[in-house]
Amino acid sequence: MEILDILILGSGPAALCLASELAKQDLNIKGISTKSPNEKWENTYGIWASELEELGLESLLSHRWCKTVSFFGDGENKKGDTPTKHNYDYGLINQEAFQNELLKKCKGIEWLNETAKEIKEKNKLSEVTCFSGLKINARLVIDASGHKSNFVKRPVQNEIAQQAAYGIVGKFTSPPVNKEQFVLMDFRPNHLNNEEKLSSPSFLYAMDLGNETFFVEETSLASYPALSQENLKKRLYKRLNSKGIEVSEIFHEENCLFPMNLPLPFKKQFVLGFGGAASMVHPASGYMVGSLLRRAPLLAQKLAIFLKEPQLSSLELASKGWEILWPYELTQRHKLYQYGLRRLMSFDESRLRSFFSNFFRLSTNEWVGFLTNTLPLPKLIYVMSKMFINSPLKVKLGMLKLN
């Protein structure tokens, strides 16, 4: 009977990021997934360029923008249309190049076209039974199949906030954003009536892709219940039409829906998670790729060390893995971000615009560190305190839950 060191569930970015690091560790590894790891990834992945530069991976960007802005005014006059300039480069990852780079590093790892039905701990090992009837034994199972994992256990939480987005890559009757411009957040509400302004806020995320092609996406940062794709599509078209812009050709439609505030998994369990299954989505932004790339190497190195101890069971290996993935520092940071997200979800569009306008008055290092989850805990506490002190009264009251 073959006993793997590690069996990975999934074949998306999280699975391949970790597998590409584990492949360096001289371990017996396989993966299983309903999709081939070679199947093209459809979603677009944006990232602050510095996150890839720090890892020497900036060549994976298909586009890079220096003109990065947001709009937090009311859109009613010149002042309300004034952009907030970020002066920080943003990039779009070339999905094909990113996927191929990871697959190249995963050479030697076989992926089986299987789906796990049940995972049991048996004689200190993990026995995975697939829907086909195939049984696979491994010392450790890592679920990197996404946030809908059936095997990673976490505290029950009824109200899970979701980030939802509907987007279009296409051509338009006139440019939806300026030439060579990237818009992180356009919260201007002047295309909405008073009743619509009372509903859960959303913003435009948009970029010039060149050759008269643009990506525009209506995004709800976090909402419970989630905004529907139909609602977001209507909002996007209304936003465009209010500027006299019509869609002339669609190359790709994007639909996004994922949880922003999943509780952290229990650390004492015999399955380890990674990516969405491990609650690694950043509650402040919804981003995860940078975190996957930064956190995979250490986890892979530590797991290789733990696996050298033959007496360790699946439960012990996974528990040690969870401690590496979610140490005290990262856990406390996550709690702070989740608190902030809960407060933002209670803000109407006016208060939310005021919050973000104030947020981007932080120094570049502070707001970038906040959005990329790279600030050490003491610095994060300092930045959040500074942000609160400098906030307008209505934002302070909202953060304190007093209004």
Predicted features and spans:
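Beta1/beta-strand and adjacent pyrophosphate-binding region of the FAD-binding site
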Residues: M1-A14
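A conserved beta-strand/loop capping segment in the N-terminal third of enzymes
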Residues: A49-E114, I119-N123
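Conserved Rossmann-like nucleotide-cofactor binding loop
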Residues: A14, P37, K148
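N-terminal FAD cofactor-binding segment of flavoenzymes
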Residues: C17, E21-G75
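Predominantly flavin-linked oxidoreductase catalytic cores and closely associated redox partners
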Residues: K105-E246
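Redox-cofactor binding/interface segments in oxidoreductases and associated redox assembly factors
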Residues: L9, D143-A144, G273-G275
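FAD/FMN-dependent oxidoreductases across multiple families
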Residues: A116, L198, L204, S220-K302
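C-terminal helical "tail/cap" subdomain of flavin- and related membrane-associated enzymes
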Residues: A300-N403
